[in-house]
Amino acid sequence: MMIITHKKKNALAVVVSISLAFAIGGLAGQVTQGAIPGWYAQLNKPFFNPPNYIFAPVWTLLYFLMGWAAARVWLKGRHHKWGKTALYHYGAQLLFNGLWSLVFFGLHQPLGALVVIIILGILIERSIYWFRLVDRPAAYMLYPYLGWVSFATLLNLAIFWLN
């Protein structure tokens, strides 16, 4: 008979949660990579557009923080309505995160992607709100993500405007 300790359950929750965030990021990255050398390279971009090599390390850190934050909420609040609500919002924003790459890079639709990223920002803000009720450090872990997505929203708007 195998006994799973409390520490092992916690570690498993963290690994699964971070892996889920990276899975969404990996799928989004697959869509993105194909568009970078062709369609995206031809777009007019604003002066504040970062170089392409910046995006992968930033997103790697953000997906790690997102997954870790979600695991903290899962472990502390999965049996409480606030915890469940927080995780529903988190799941929705994770789907919109992946959807943005599909719409922007896969479908080449900056305007449609702008709509998606605005909804994404709202869902991140709501996730932070609910995470804070369950685990304040988990909410703080999402602030860099909200900041980056806010910047990406401005970048998306500028690309739409310039093209």
Protein language model annotation of sequence segments:
Residues 50-64, 107-120:
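Membrane-interface loop-to-helix entry segments
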Residues 34-47:
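Membrane-interface helix termini and inter-helical loops of multi-pass transporters
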Residues 4-9, 74-84, 132-139:
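Membrane-interface helix-boundary motifs at transmembrane edges
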Residues 104-109, 125-139:
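Membrane-helix boundary connector in multi-pass membrane proteins
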Residues 3-31:
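N-terminal signal-anchor transmembrane alpha helix
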